[in-house]
Amino acid sequence: MMQQTSEIIQAPYLKRYYAPASTGNFSVGFDLLGAAFEPISGELFGDVLDIVAEQAELELELTGRYVHQLPADSSDNLVLSCFYAFEQTLGRSLPRLALRLHKNLPVGSGLGSSACSIVVACYAFNDYFGKPLSDNQLLQLMAQAEGGVSGSVHYDNVAPSFYGGLQLMLPDSAQLCRALPWFAHWRVVLCYPGTVLSTKAARAVLPKQLSLTLSIAFAGMLSRFVSALYSADEAEAVAALRDLVAEPARTPLLPELPALRAGLAELGVLHLGISGAGPTLFALCHNDAQAQLAAEYLARHYEKNQDATTQICRLSATGARAL
């Protein structure tokens, strides 16, 4: 059953901000590709942060569909740690704020939940306090905060959630990431089964080293995918969507994957992959009609409980923003 995910309570605020869900890796680009998505319904599928007021003490109220998955003590929250990290980066004291986080992404889902909270918080603080940090400085701050959660600094969730689009990470480049072309008719179905798989646990099963043969194959397949996007060769891009690094190690954690992939292939779905570290899966579809079939199939065969959600999405063009 496809359920509504966005729960935005009606309450006063000074400014309201939003950051979308994201899919890290996008199968072929482990730690190097990430895409931000938004439902075609217009629903907000991501976290919303309200700056409610300036006051004497920093305070955070938690609400939203997945608030029950967060630590009960709001002082142990990424939004507050981002405020202090932002303040430390500026090197000066900032006015304290009353904040409200609408947690509408599930935790440990493979949808960039921690990155989403980090991005919406850092974006909000930078905007509210007059944009003292450049986009590059802000993205670096986001990635450092994300590294504290996942165990390693990587940009493939924070970059797309911040900028939108399908982003290619650029190691050792001042630019950090670059938006890639995308096929406008593509739709992506995101299916979260309602179970939790922490990023740290999912990374723990990965190989510590890759053989020379596998390294060449990985680089070649990613190059093939990027080249196909720039050439607007859809068939070649789909053929290149092969996860040679993470999926072989993570499939034992997601035993339904092979059968679901076979079932969706019968419906003509272009590709089924693991969203980030999982357990969310993403189905790449050629159009809205195919996406509807894929969504119904995944909701029927992969959703496990009331926390589950299935969303038909398009690429998010804008990323984080004020509402």
Predicted features and spans:
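Short beta-strand segments
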Residues: 18-20, 161-163, 170, 190-194, ...
